């Protein structure tokens, strides 16, 4: 059973509040019945339907940090954006806390796209997602599954496939491995 979540209404971010955007707290459900908490950012001068972006990550972080800053900055540039806490994290529901699942986390992005696509002020044909750090891969998973996602940005620090093959700093670059 999904527990009722309580949202902090005061500005609780690690970055200053922009005077160029409106901010509000929203929630939406995933297909797994979990409630995700999100910060919605809308340009103050918004007119008509706007393109939208869902943002999450880095892995283990909450929307009051990096993803919120990205979302607010993109709203200043004319997008409707949401930064959400993944399932089991921050203000979102799910037990046990601080649990990760690629399938559930991919669904988190898809649920964010569902939420955005149903808003009257969003152009549902122009929805993008941004995944930061470990969430870059989750964003790619979501984009591969959902044709409504028209653009995907994966902001990742390094190539984990190279690390898997060669070890950190190519430590396993032995003659036998080659």
List PLM regions with ranges.
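Conserved alpha/beta-hydrolase
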Residues: 73-93
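The serine-hydrolase catalytic nucleophile loop
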Residues: 60-72, 86
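Alpha/beta-hydrolase fold nucleophile elbow
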Residues: 120-133
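N-terminal cap/lid segment of alpha/beta-hydrolase-fold proteins
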Residues: 2-48
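Alpha/beta-hydrolase active-site loop
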Residues: 99-120
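Alpha/beta-hydrolase-fold enzymes
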Residues: 138-178
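Glycine-rich "HGGG/HGxG" loop immediately N-terminal to the catalytic nucleophile
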Residues: 65, 88-100
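Short beta-strand element of the alpha/beta-hydrolase
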Residues: 48-58
């Amino acid at each position: 059973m999904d527990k009722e979540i309580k949202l902090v209404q005061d500005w609780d971010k690690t970055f200053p509040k922009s005077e160029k955007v409106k901010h509000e707290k929203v929630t939406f459900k995933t297909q797994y019945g979990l409630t995700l908490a999100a910060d919605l950012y809308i340009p103050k001068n918004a007119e008509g339907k706007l393109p939208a972006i869902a943002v999450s990550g880095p892995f283990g972080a909450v929307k009051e940090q990096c993803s919120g800053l990205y979302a607010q900055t993109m709203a200043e540039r004319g997008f409707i954006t949401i930064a959400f806490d993944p399932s089991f994290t921050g203000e979102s529901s799910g037990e046990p806390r601080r649990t990760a699942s690629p399938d559930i986390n991919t669904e988190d992005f898809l649920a964010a796209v569902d939420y955005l696509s149903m808003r009257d002020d969003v152009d549902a044909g122009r929805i993008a997602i941004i995944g930061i750090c470990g969430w870059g891969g989750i964003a790619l998973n979501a984009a591969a599954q959902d044709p409504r996602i028209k653009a995907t940005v994966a902001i990742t620090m390094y190539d984990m496939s190279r690390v898997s093959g060669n070890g950190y700093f190519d430590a396993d670059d032995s003659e036998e491995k080659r």
